[in-house]
Structure formats: structure tokens, C-alpha cells
């Protein structure tokens, strides 16, 4: 097994096994959505209303609908999405502060 496959295969397998919806962005900018039905060294079968065979060399990014946690032993596990933490003031607060000056 190639060293580059050691992260890719468990990641794709977790997405497939958990039936996590994914968005796949191709290098030409096209966005495909569905669930990973199967994959091998060269292709990913993406299922939505139809099954599409997508060549990996045409893929730029795979974005799962929810987070995947990775264990050091190579296995992956799905997690519910985490809520974003707000670290700045809301825009309304900034606008209100500017008007008061």
C-alpha cells in the first residue's frame, strides 16, 4: 500500500460506511453531491439520484456534511457537527458603536 493511501482509504471508508453526504469539488470547479457508494485506487462511485464514477485525478476537494474524527490506528469515526464559537462582535454591535461616536 502506498504511503499516501494510509489516510485516504480509512477516511473514504468512514464516509462510505456511515453514509455521510459529501460535496465533491472537481478541479474544473464543478460541485457534485451524494454519498460514497464505493471507491478504489482510481475512482469514487458517488450515488445521488444516479451513480456517477468520478476519477480521483479530477477531484480537488471532498467535503463531508459532518466532521470525521481520526484515530491514530487508522480508523475513522463520524461526529456530529460542532457549533461555531463566536470570537468577534456581531456586525450590528460594531455598527451601533460607530454611530454613537
Curated annotation (Swiss-Prot):
Question: In what residue span(s) does the Sm domain sit?
Answer: 9-68
Q: What is the lineage of its organism?
A: Bacteria, Pseudomonadati, Pseudomonadota, Gammaproteobacteria, Pasteurellales
Q: Does the keyword Transport apply?
A: no
Name the Pfam families for this protein.
Answer: Hfq
Where does the record place the region Disordered? 68-91
Q: How does it assemble?
A: Homohexamer.
Q: Which PANTHER family match?
A: RNA-BINDING PROTEIN HFQ
What gene name is listed for this protein?
hfq
Described function: RNA chaperone that binds small regulatory RNA (sRNAs) and mRNAs to facilitate mRNA translational regulation in response to envelope stress, environmental stress and changes in metabolite concentrations. Also binds with high specificity to tRNAs.
What this protein is called in its record is RNA-binding protein Hfq
GO cellular component labels:
cytosol
Give the family from UniProt: Belongs to the Hfq family.
Q: Biological process (GO) annotations?
A: regulation of DNA-templated transcription; regulation of RNA stability; regulation of translation, ncRNA-mediated
The species this protein belongs to is Haemophilus ducreyi (strain 35000HP / ATCC 700724)
Q: Where is the composition biased (Low complexity)?
A: 77-91
Q: Which GO terms describe its molecular function?
A: RNA binding
